Curated annotation (Swiss-Prot):
GO CC annotation terms, alphabetical: nucleus
Coiled-coil spans in chain: 94-137, 228-258, 330-407
Bias (Low complexity): 44-75, 128-140, 158-198, 506-516
Protein name, UniProt field: Probable basic-leucine zipper transcription factor R
Primary location class: nucleus
Name of encoding gene: bzpR
């Protein structure tokens, strides 16, 4: 191994490392492919024929031994020949003992081979690590295995041809030896012993592999192998030759063994344990040997093709684990795909089942509906059929009764004469003779016919009996004895009971006559039956025609009745709809009339009162003011009682009622900010400069005094006072800016009205405050006013919109600052603030009374025709309004208390 240290240090020569590590892994791969344990591996070697080349002596016995050895070596893999040997030698105890010893030797060889392989692997790993360190020390970089250059590997040569030549020479020697064996019995015995010994030696040679050969394979890599196909062909040829030779030998041995017997006595063999070895176990061992040969051939094939070996010597332990995980995941991928496919198939099957169930349910519903329809149709058909049957039975009964009466009355004259003759004979003779057999037959037939007629009458009488005339009733009540059926009676009168016997010729003639008469009667009966059938068919046709006519009439009548019924329903529905429509129109007319009256009253009040009703506050805002006032009164009462829970509840209620204050404020501003009100303010000369008299708690010197007193009363902390002062400062800045913007917009709007809407020629300026001193108004007339442009109109509308927004911002500024001030304070302090400020201090009752007084005063000023009466009426109204004011105040205080 020391010879290979120096060349392995170069990075270009790493082939032996690959082969050394590849052989140990190749052994494991072959085990996995054939599913064979380590205990059953037998490394057979076909190169044992070298012993034959070294032992070519002149003695015939030695040549026989060598030839037998070669034959046994070549025939180990053939199961047919071994089966024959097993059959011949399975009962020999020596053979069994030898097999046992062979098995032990085989096991020992296997253990030795495994130990040697382990030692080689350990040595290789140690040397590989040492060489890596040497490489790193010399080249100062980590070792990396280069790619394999198979061109550098020496070519593989075949040396098995020499072995084959040796085998052929040995086979020729066998033929000569076999001839010599046939001459003497002693030589045959010696040959048999020598054959047994040679078998043992050859088996041992095949089982045990020389350690030197393994070392040569591992180190030098100069094992000369043969391709797999050529080797198989050679083995087949050898097996065929060996089979032919063995057959010849067996024939010769059989010829020799018949006259001879074994001379050498066999010694008894004492075994420690009883060996039970049967033919199948031996066959299994031989099969294992053949499998081992296949393993060796596969190893040789892999040695010939080193490109297929994966260079696993480069992988570290952690890399091997990752490699194994990747292989496991690759193996599991197809199973996962199969599982996914099965899941998809299951989902599809479930969906198909659901669809089938839905279809079945729909089909069942349809079948049920069809069954119900069919049942209804069957019931209707059954009812119609019953009606038709009843009608048919009535008609048949009416038609059959006169026919039965006629049949019952018609009696043939022959029977009447016969009955009269019988009665006369009985009266003359005064004998109690019995009737003749003919008369008895006639009577029996008569009675049977009577019974059938009675049964028919009973069946027909189940229906309601029709009305008969008196003649028909008499015919019906005639005695039953008068009814005699016409058939089965001879036309001639019967012969007397005791006449003289006529001759045979006369009897024959009489019989012939009787037969002719009977035939005539039968023909007549057939004709009558045919006539009756024709009559019945005609009657049935007539009945069917009548039924069809009756059905047509009924269908026509039913259709007409349905039409009449539908017409009645349609007319009734039309009348009801007409009534409903008339009622709707009347209600609409009533509502329109009420609206008209209300509008007339409003117009009259507007004319008289000067549009006071139009300027009235909205009912929603009035409701909000009244509710807020009531809540503040309740808060005042809770402060007196010092009830914190009620205060908190009332404050929540107060904030809930004030939610709509912004929307109501916009509605009130829209009433003021429009061209009509602005025109009136401009005509009047209104100037929004004067501040209101209401106290503003956020701005001005008076607010400072009020807030200082409130802080003392509400026990406000210094932190709260700082926040309140900063809030007031911010409010002052924003309110001053908004007030200036409002004044500018108001001036611009007033100038627009004065220039374009109210040009008064030769008149001085009404309010000189709007203009500067040098500004003059042009002396114009209505004719000289130019039309307005669209741009000017849009600009004026935008100015009005901005004025509305500024007013809303100014009003909402006060509300927002008040809300932030309430958030700074505690609930009790907030309640004190609401009670002291009282934003909802407007008394709407007083305001309404003042409006009524104003309307009455205007009416007094307008009524000039009859001033006394109008003045007295107006004074009455004023007094009445004052009385209402007092009553409202009393009611309001009563509600609060």
């Amino acid at each position: 191994m020391d010879n290979f240290e120096n060349p392995l240090l170069a990075p270009d020569q790493d082939v032996l490392l690959y082969l050394l590590d590849g052989y140990s892994q190749l052994q494991q791969l072959q085990k996995q492919q054939f599913n064979i344990h380590d205990d059953n591996i037998n490394y057979n070697n076909n190169n044992n024929n070298n012993n034959n080349n070294n032992n070519n002596n002149n003695n015939n016995n030695n040549n026989n031994n060598n030839n037998n050895n070669n034959n046994n070596n070549n025939n180990i893999g053939s199961p047919q020949i071994m089966n024959e040997n097993i059959e011949t030698n399975s009962n020999d105890p020596q053979y069994l003992e030898r097999l046992q010893s062979i098995q032990q030797q085989q096991h020992q060889c296997q253990t030795q081979i495994q130990q040697q392989l382990q030692n080689y692997q350990q040595q290789y790993e140690d040397q590989y690590q040492q060489r890596q360190q040497q490489y790193q020390d010399q080249y100062q970089k980590p070792y990396s295995s280069p790619p394999l250059n198979f061109n550098s590997i020496p070519p593989i040569t075949n040396n098995n041809n020499n072995n084959n030549n040796n085998n052929n020479n040995n086979n020729n020697n066998n033929n000569s030896n076999s001839n010599s064996n046939s001459n003497s019995n002693s030589n045959s015995n010696s040959n048999s012993n020598s054959n047994s010994n040679s078998n043992n030696n050859n088996i041992n040679n095949n089982i045990c592999i020389n350690n030197n050969d393994i070392s040569i394979f591992l180190l030098n890599n100069q094992i000369q192998l043969q391709p797999l196909q050529q080797q198989q062909q050679q083995q087949q040829q050898q097996q065929q030759q060996q089979q032919q030779q063995q057959q010849q030998q067996q024939q010769q041995q059989q010829q020799q063994q018949q006259p001879t017997q074994p001379t050498q006595p066999t010694k008894p063999i004492q075994l420690t344990q009883p060996i039970q070895l049967t033919q199948p176990t031996l066959l299994e061992e031989l099969k294992d040997i053949s499998i081992q040969q296949q393993l060796l051939s596969a190893i040789q094939q892999t040695a010939q093709s080193p490109q297929q070996i994966h260079p696993l010597q480069q992988l570290q332990p952690y890399q091997l684990q990752s490699y194994q995980q990747i292989q496991a995941s690759q193996q599991l991928q197809p199973y996962q795909q199969l599982i996914q496919l099965q899941q998809l198939q299951l989902q599809q099957l479930e969906e198909e089942k659901r669809q089938q169930q839905k279809q079945l349910l729909l089909q069942q519903q349809q079948l049920q509906e069809q069954q119900e329809k069919l049942q209804q149709q069957l019931l209707q058909q059954q009812k119609q059929q019953l009606k038709q049957k009843v009608k048919q039975q009535k008609q048949q009964h009416q038609k059959q009764q006169p026919q039965q009466q006629q049949q019952s009355i018609q009696i043939p004259p022959e029977l009447q004469n016969y009955i009269l003759n019988n009665n006369n004979n009985n009266n003359n003779n005064n004998t109690n003779k019995t009737l003749s057999p003919i008369s008895e037959m006639i009577q029996n037939q008569f009675l049977n016919n009577q019974q059938t007629i009675l049964n028919q009458n009973n069946s027909t009488l189940q229906l309601p009996t029709p009305f008969y005339s008196p003649q028909q009733q008499q015919q019906q009540h005639t005695p039953i004895s008068s009814f005699i059926p016409p058939p089965s009676l001879p036309s001639s009168p019967p012969s007397p009971p005791s006449p003289p016997s006529p001759p045979p010729q006369q009897q024959q003639q009489q019989q012939q006559q009787q037969q002719q008469q009977q035939q005539q009667q039968q023909q007549q009966q057939q004709q009558q039956q045919q006539q009756q059938q024709q009559q019945l068919q005609q009657q049935q046709l007539q009945q069917q025609q009548l039924q069809q006519q009756h059905q047509l009439k009924e269908s026509y009548e039913s259709k007409e009745s349905i039409k009449k019924y539908n017409q009645n329903i349609a007319s009734r529905n039309y009348r009801l709809k007409k009534k409903d429509y008339i009622k709707e129109i009347e209600n609409k007319i009533a509502t329109l009339s009420l609206e008209n009256n209300r509008l007339e009253k409003e117009n009259g009040s507007i004319r008289t009162n000067g549009s006071i009703e139009m300027m009235r506050m909205e009912p929603e805002s009035m409701k909000m003011l009244m509710d807020g006032k009531l809540i503040i009164e309740n808060i005042k009462h809770a402060l007196i009682i010092d009830d914190e829970k009620s205060l908190i509840y009332l404050l929540h209620q107060y904030h809930r009622t004030i939610d709509q204050r912004y929307s109501l404020l916009e509605k009130e501003v829209n009433k003021l900010i429009n061209p009509y009100t602005q025109l009136r303010l401009c005509c009047i000369g209104y100037v929004p400069k004067s501040s209101p008299l209401v106290l503003n708690i956020f701005q001005g010197p008076e607010s400072d005094k009020w807030l200082n007193l409130f802080k003392i009363e509400a026990n406000i902390t210094p932190e709260q006072s700082i926040k309140i002062d900063s809030l007031r400062f911010q409010y002052g800045k924003v309110s001053s800016r908004l007030s200036n913007e409002l004044l500018e917009l108001d001036l611009i709007i007033k100038r627009f009205f004065i220039k374009n809407v109210l040009p008064t020629p030769d008149t001085p300026l009404l309010n000189s405050d709007y203009y500067s001193e040098g500004e003059l108004i042009p002396n114009t007339t209505t004719e000289s006013i130019a039309p307005l442009n669209n741009f000017e109109l849009l600009d004026f509308a935008s100015k009005l919109e901005s004025l509305k927004n500024k007013i809303i911002l100014n009003a909402s500024l006060g509300l927002d600052t008040f809300a932030t001030l309430c958030s700074i304070l505690t609930p009790k302090q907030e309640a004190l603030l609401l009670v002291r400020v009282n934003l909802f201090c407007i008394d709407l009752h007083h305001h309404d009374i003042l409006g009524e007084v104003w309307t009455n005063v205007n009416q007094i000023s307008n009524s000039l025709s009859n001033p006394l009466t109008s003045f007295s009426d107006s004074m009455k109204k004023i007094n009445f309004s004052f009385l209402q004011l007092d009553n409202n105040n009393n009611n309001y205080h009563y509600k609060i208390n």
